[in-house]
UniProtKB/Swiss-Prot annotation:
Taxonomic placement: Bacteria, Pseudomonadati, Pseudomonadota, Gammaproteobacteria, Enterobacterales
Cofactor: FAD
Identification of the protein by name: tRNA uridine 5-carboxymethylaminomethyl modification enzyme MnmG
Species of provenance: Shigella sonnei (strain Ss046)
Coiled-coil ranges from the UniProt annotation: none
Superkingdom in the source lineage: Bacteria
Compartments (UniProt record): Cytoplasm
Amino acid sequence: MFYPDPFDVIIIGGGHAGTEAAMAAARMGQQTLLLTHNIDTLGQMSCNPAIGGIGKGHLVKEVDALGGLMAKAIDQAGIQFRILNASKGPAVRATRAQADRVLYRQAVRTALENQPNLMIFQQAVEDLIVENDRVVGAVTQMGLKFRAKAVVLTVGTFLDGKIHIGLDNYSGGRAGDPPSIPLSRRLRELPLRVGRLKTGTPPRIDARTIDFSVLAQQHGDNPMPVFSFMGNASQHPQQVPCYITHTNEKTHDVIRSNLDRSPMYAGVIEGVGPRYCPSIEDKVMRFADRNQHQIFLEPEGLTSNEIYPNGISTSLPFDVQMQIVRSMQGMENAKIVRPGYAIEYDFFDPRDLKPTLESKFIQGLFFAGQINGTTGYEEAAAQGLLVGLNAARLSADKEGWAPARSQAYLGVLVDDLCTLGTKEPYRMFTSRAEYRLMLREDNADLRLTEIGRELGLVDDERWARFNEKLENIERERQRLKSTWVTPSAEAAAEVNAHLTAPLSREASGEDLLRRPEMTYEKLTTLTPFAPALTDEQAAEQVEIQVKYEGYIARQQDEIEKQLRNENTLLPATLDYRQVSGLSNEVIAKLNDHKPASIGQASRISGVTPAAISILLVWLKKQGMLRRSA
């Protein structure tokens, strides 16, 4: 039977991609349905109880700048907050927080259940309704049919998921959850390229069986960082430390002597695992010269005894896992409460997607998260927000939107996936962005909130706070520019006490702030330049904008030069055999990838600068030289 009411957008899956997609589509006023096999696992952290990190924290800030959920949820659930790379430049500084799994899940569910235009329904999806190469609905396991103008797949590791512990394996979406086999079969019938990937998770340890007294502690930062531009540290729950132990030669001997029982090394697992989050058996074999590896013992929550040993993801048999755990300092008597495992699952080639993450072959069908070959909650959430936005726009007969590489890490992520594809789980790093000085955590709102407002993602409260911050930045910069001190002034001695070289000429507040030894905090304690802004976010922006003004201006020039051709559109129906002068290899690659723009085409391996020049000349001759807005 058909459900009596139609929807604008259906989201299939309630993980980090699905929840952001559902919230985004509903925020934009579209009638949205979130289908999940279990309402109690909405926002579940299937692996590491943490949000953020290098590159990942940048994505979380961007999701927040566009009105998303993840940053707000972790501010309510984070039990240890740190700034990584704090001693380095602002481009690579990143926020990371340990999470209480239960509090995080509660924060996500509360937000979903209080979001207007959003309905949540508990049923697994087994089929899609496709008519004339357009998706028009979904069918659940009990045969209930839902109609919609757009359908979003955010199914994580559930598509034909297979869990491995040693040489034993069984079907599962993750530990304790069933796989989605009928939907996997249905998707394989569609004209989509499919592959298999693998990820893994470590065993969980009973904290009561660990001797923490012999281990080093790792505390969070004070003052505590905040993820959301709308948040403050008073929202954080109780803060707790993590602990550090190490593997040793005994650990490594146990692993080496049991490799024949590893499904990875025995050839049982075919899927490729994440390069930057390898299993402990992989680390021991790949880095044979290392006699130890650092392991972080991370609490899973304030009311839980479970510890997540970050660094020993494994699919070795349970008896070997016990030996590995008990070989490490402080864990000689440790007990495992959940075994580690690896999971293989289907993913679909993201090169078959438009930059909006809509399928090139099935109109109205969108993909986000691990189904696109990514790994990580943050990567999933960012894609989820983008597909929710674009599914909503499609259902309202509006053009889709995707950020450029120069606008956001989300733009880098989507461009990498849609242009290059991936053969292993894709993780975001700051090194993937060529314009990372412009794409900092601290300015995510300055880059994206105005766009989010235009798209309908940003509410009145966030918009008012954003404009207040802009005004504070502008007012303070003008004040510092127009406040001067001379070498002969009474205040010169006070100023010179904070400088490595005394004043030799008149200097403004901005001139002084450009000096390496001067900070905004110091500057605004000096009589001529007091008081400091009470808006800490605005104060941070003032300091960064002044200190890095020259570098930022140079990078902006680079972006403008690159954008002249980057946004030149390529017709989706163009047969590149029509373009004389291109090599057969280039023609084959362009016809295979069908890039949306010159920028995308230039990043395809084997497409040379000469080929790009030929393309531009041909487009001009044909009167087809058009640039996107």
